[in-house]
């Protein structure tokens, strides 16, 4: 599906091909990432310095960078003092200088670089630029132009219509099957994936007995303005859980800041997820769970590497605690998406915030029961879990008590 690595023998063939997509709940966001691109003025300035020192200011790449930097600097940004926002359009010559820079990049990559440090940086800067140029060739109605940073702005062509692209990219195939444990609720997910009303939707029952997972909800106000005061109750709930039933637990937080705030007050031995963890560090982090016997308590970030894709069957994991409802951080990108979904689907908050949040919650809770014989607990700490709007986003087999 990625236009940069399009598999022509599949998508351009006339023969029968059926596409199977696992973990399809990630697809809308992945498509948006693939179709979006950016021009980073600050990054270009740093790289231009390296290129200038190594190859001289007369080098074609240096000149092409200067043209793009000048074009970004000449953009008419709002005079309200804001540090980010959207632009209705870009000047006519903006695309031309960006294409010229991409050509200069490609020519430079064919050279035997006299500068070692620039090699990797060229690739890091080139790929978003190529994506930006591809984005600008598509229908402008499918994109929003965003700017970030007033002094040296970053300009992003942000893809909005992932459903339309997915539908167009797969229309020549004989069939597409999307599946995931978190494609719920199906009507909303079908819209996000560009499905038609007559497309078949199936919700399979959980293969695991629902009584094997005890889910309890506690009313805690975890909204940003109340997080400091919420820490006291969160610490109390975690302590009560691991004291009442010692074992191996994962606790998930909506952000690293909230995680650290709670860790400072939690008087229990525990591991804390770090922002940057290589494969060896991740494996070491999970060793406490994969060893026979003993207890383990770890504080992690919801939606991170430890809330999806890890398998801890049997007594390797006794339960999880989820703090908050997983709403994405409010930022320029999410607010632009919210406005887009409000226009196209009628409920921007549901599609931009609630659905992605509850998908992360469902994935985290799904770490507990991995086989037919597993048993465990999940503790949901947020008052919004009792709201009907959030209840309908929970898997049908969940039995939540208070």
Predicted regions mapped to residue ranges:
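Conserved coupling segment at the C-terminus of the helicase ATP-binding
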Residues: 4-250, 254-266
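Conserved RecA-like helicase motor-core motifs
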Residues: 198-203, 267-286
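A glycine-rich phosphate-binding loop feature that marks nucleotide/adenosyl-phosphate handling sites
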Residues: 254-262, 378-387
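N-terminal targeting/trafficking signals and adjacent low-complexity tails
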Residues: 349, 379-402
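Switch/connector loops and helix/strand junctions flanking conserved nucleotide-binding motifs
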Residues: 27-30, 185-192, 259-261, 307-311, ...
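Conserved RecA-like P-loop NTPase helicase motor core
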Residues: 219-229, 275-385
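Short His-Asn-centered micro-motif
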Residues: 1, 21, 158, 179-181, ...
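Short, solvent-exposed amphipathic alpha-helical segments in soluble enzyme
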Residues: 191-196, 265-267, 313-317, 337-338, ...
